[in-house]
Amino acid sequence: MRCLVLLLGLLGGSALAQTPTPSDYKHPPMPEPMREGKVSVDPAAKFTHFRVGNKNVKSVYIDGTRVWVGTSGGVIRYDTRDDSFKLFDAKSGLLSNGVFYVGRIQGKLTVGTYGGGMSVLMDEAKGTWKTYNIPEGLGDAFIYDVLEAKNGDIWIATWSGANRVRGGALDDRSKWDLYTVENTKGGVPNDWIYGLAEGRNGDIWLATEGGMARFANGKFENWNHARGLGASYDRVKADIAFKNDPSKQSVHHAKQKEEMGLSGVDVAYNPNYVVSLEVDATGQVWAGTWGGGLSRFDGKKWISYTTSDGLPGNHVFMLQKDAKGRLWIGTNNGLTTWEGGKFGKRLSTADGLFANNIFSMAVGAEGDLWIGSFGGVTHLWPSK
């Protein structure tokens, strides 16, 4: 890998400590991010690290020379030209600091938040936002993903169904549709929607807590574990390293697991719980599950991959394709690629990644990667 390093300290005017060697990357909890900071440079180091304190980085978006980082403490805009940055949070116009999605919709920077709806940056210089929430048509104020389809429709993944705004007419309430389990008669398998992607033929894929759904020709079809999604418990039970089991934290998640007949499985395993989604360059659909590994849909059936096949971890939090056609896979145990029908080398903290739990990623114009995890972002250049 060809790399350089640069540390961005969100520490209110004090540079970060010197970077440890790549073989000894251990990052103690950092102070809360502030609005000012300085930059320190270590040309000899392998990776670039951007520390964001005790925060999860759920979304990374590349916008020319700027990198937008969505965290549980707001959105950080970092400019690679001059190493400047700015924090947008509840103090500067967002209705919630928790950010799940950052991207451009209809040319404007758009943020999906945890409980604060969808906010659009109308004037970047002035920092003015316009927010769309339940009164405007959102199914829920918790927004996990947003997609602008080729036909102009805008899809919004919420925790109370999927919104479609026909023609992208966000300010016309009559153009807002909401698809739920109830009004699609089970076509949408679960109202908690975690991801959106567009297929090669314009079909829309939805990742939900109850499986995968596809919207095509005005109708929904869905797949769950019973139809081949996710690896069986017998295949993964010896390697469930990730300990966070949502069923132990909420009645909702416990009910989902019970409905699958998994209430007796006392580990973080639910193959219907799809938390990442991507359509690759060949049109195949990939779904990352909660403990059930990685599943690929070839147009007819689902094929699942686990740690026994070379996947670093069976919890797949992030999927991202690059310009070379590679699929990047972020798991609970590091990062890898899928290329040429096989998994590539595993990258982990031992190689210099900020953390092994990989939640988000964006690919730069030169093929460089910006990888989000708990506590920060790693910037690296993969091998040619």
Each language-model region and where it sits:
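Carboxylate-rich, polar loop motifs that coordinate divalent cations or form catalytic acidic clusters
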Residues: A17-K384
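Bacterial N-terminal signal peptides
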Residues: L4-S14
